[in-house]
Curated annotation (Swiss-Prot):
Belongs to the RapZ-like family. InterPro entries: P-loop_NTPase, RapZ-like, RapZ-like_N, RapZ_C. It comes from the Bacteria. Gene3D superfamilies: P-loop containing nucleotide triphosphate hydrolases. It comes from Trichlorobacter lovleyi (strain ATCC BAA-1151 / DSM 17278 / SZ). This is Nucleotide-binding protein Glov_2163. Displays ATPase and GTPase activities. One of its GO terms (molecular function) is ATP binding.
Amino acid sequence: MRIVVITGMSGSGKSTAVRALEDEGFYCIDNLPVRLFRQFVELIEKSGESFKGVVLVTDIRGRDLSTGIVESFRELRSVGHELEVLFFDASDEVLIRRFAETRRRHPADEHCTVPEGIRIERERLAALRQNATLIIDTSEFNVHQLKEQVIRAIKGEQGSSNFTVEVVSFGFRYGVPLDASLVMDVRFLPNPHFVPALRPYSGQEPAVRQFVLEQPDTTAFLDHFFNLLQFLIPAYCREGKSYLTIAIGCTGGRHRSVAITEATAARLETLGLKVRISHRDIEKG
């Protein structure tokens, strides 16, 4: 049976994700104690009901969250279940704003401030985050974008044979993407921003792309980076990962990182992988 565990930070969009999966035909249950995971799955199997899978929501509200959660995952996988763990996150600033908009207390402790609650929650969920199949950063998403991302993740990534790589360009000025598995800094390359004829254009413009890719250091970097990815991706597959997010950053996320992201993605596609490209800050830089 396919099992999707939804977890992550309060205010990061877990409820929206659950509703999206219910619409896709998954049976969803919220705040189930970890010790009951396997028994619940067995009951669903015996019921004879037809579902695409089961969604189990667990977060800081669970009293037994810190004891046995990773072991529970291993147990479910050991008896043949396809288990995915989706961890939803967002920047502290975004989470604080969302709590202010809803006027809710933070569930970590009703007596603490929201920022303190977020800090406590991050500590308690650290092991879950480390064992996630996929981390989804919802900081920049609206409700519709979040639903789309969840559906794409569920429909697109189902095992190492369909390993998916998302290559994201970003600007360090706006922060590192929270869901990045690998982060590469390409600020060592010459910056088209200081070439007046190139400054107005992004790294998708042929002239800017040519400027970046024809630098001697660029060729060497791409060769070394691609060799590293050829080593890492099979290792991720062996560990049961089905999704890798590579974040490539420059100062503003408009020129160098965009060109390098597209060049990296083109090389990865030659390996037969599913590759997605996104340029987070291309309109900001």
